[in-house]
């Protein structure tokens, strides 16, 4: 296997909080998949949840080398967890097509958050 891409992102949680206070659900609706939206609505710390998802999706777009454009959207990158809680990505629509085009075989995700920040790294392998 070879590394095809690496992306990382850090988000100031208070910035996400300010957007949520100003625009309500708009940001969450724009970036979350339907399943993530359900988790967001029930989460004890929804802004922290949203900040972590935003960081992963930004990191994924960087790892793919595309950013969010040319048919890609944040909600096409869905963060899912295995039975032990390990995060990974489920790709939808154009993101899934791009993964096939690039020959992606594995996706690796790591998340971290502290009081003020959330960060994520995504590695894609062939």
UniProtKB/Swiss-Prot annotation:
It is an enzyme of class 2 (transferase). Mg(2+) binds at residues 9, 58. Its cofactor is Mg(2+). Its EC number is 2.7.8.7. Its main location: cytoplasm. Belongs to the P-Pant transferase superfamily. AcpS family. Transfers the 4'-phosphopantetheine moiety from coenzyme A to a Ser of acyl-carrier-protein. This is Holo-[acyl-carrier-protein] synthase. The lineage of its organism: Bacteria, Pseudomonadati, Pseudomonadota, Gammaproteobacteria, Enterobacterales. The gene is acpS.
